[in-house]
């Protein structure tokens, strides 16, 4: 049951590759695609830093990558959209708890796999901007030559853009979690959902 809190293998594998294109630059205002293109070097610099390659530095390396994720992902928006109508029934304290747990789940589920990236090319194929909303379309070329389309849905925040959904081969990360969370809440309770997320986090924190 705990595994149902994590997206499928195809989603997780492609997402961790796509995350390399999502390191915020913290620079002046840029168009969404320009921000994605310019930001890849920040993550690659962490992965290629010789000081962070030895096994004992793995926690430091992971923390550096997670910090970059915090800069580009709108975890509040992702959490709210993933809970959908159930979000409205939560107190402010419950919302804060959920955002904290869910963002930790996302980061640990995907960031821990980031080092599996081995140079797969990322092609930027288009951009649609509608006010404060944008979609950047890309595709990943896998080692066997398969093209995997990945779309990034983004919200404008100040001078930059934050990602609130990733759509891989037509499957939305947010919609995937929304369906899982809704099933658990409907068949059990919101409290049970929190317990399952906490249990999954314990699994991810346990060294293997």
What is each stretch, according to the model?
Residues 1-8:
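N-terminal secretory signal peptides that target proteins for export/translocation
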Residues 37, 44-46, 99, 123, ...:
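Soluble periplasmic/extracytoplasmic beta-strand elements of cell-envelope proteins
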Residues 10-23:
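Bacterial N-terminal signal peptides
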Residues 23-30:
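Bacterial Sec-dependent signal peptides at the C-terminal "C-region" and cleavage site
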Residues 147-175:
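Short beta-strand edge/turn micro-motifs at domain boundaries
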Residues 108-148, 197-208:
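Surface-exposed, charged secondary-structure patches
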Residues 31-110:
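Early exported N-terminus immediately downstream of N-terminal targeting peptides
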Residues 168-208:
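Low-complexity, intrinsically disordered terminal/linker segments enriched in charged
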């Amino acid at each position: 049951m705990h595994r149902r809190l994590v997206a499928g293998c195809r989603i997780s594998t492609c997402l961790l590759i796509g995350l390399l294109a999502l390191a915020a630059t913290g620079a002046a205002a840029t168009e969404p695609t320009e921000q994605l293109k310019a930001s890849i070097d920040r993550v690659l610099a962490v992965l290629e830093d010789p000081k962070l390659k030895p096994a004992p530095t793995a926690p430091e390396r992971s923390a550096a990558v997670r910090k970059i994720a915090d800069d580009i992902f709108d975890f509040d928006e992702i959490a709210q959209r993933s809970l959908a109508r159930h979000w409205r029934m939560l107190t402010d304290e419950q919302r804060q708890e959920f955002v904290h747990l869910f963002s930790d789940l996302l980061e640990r589920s995907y960031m821990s796999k980031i080092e599996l990236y081995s140079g797969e090319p990322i092609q930027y194929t288009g951009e649609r901007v509608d006010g404060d909303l944008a979609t950047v379309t890309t595709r990943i070329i896998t080692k066997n030559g398969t093209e995997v389309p990945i779309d990034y849905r983004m919200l404008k925040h100040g001078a930059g853009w934050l990602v609130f959904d990733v759509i891989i081969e037509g499957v939305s990360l947010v919609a995937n979690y929304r369906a899982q969370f809704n099933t658990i809440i409907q068949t059990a309770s919101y409290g049970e959902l929190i317990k399952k997320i906490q249990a999954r986090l314990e699994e991810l924190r346990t060294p293997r």
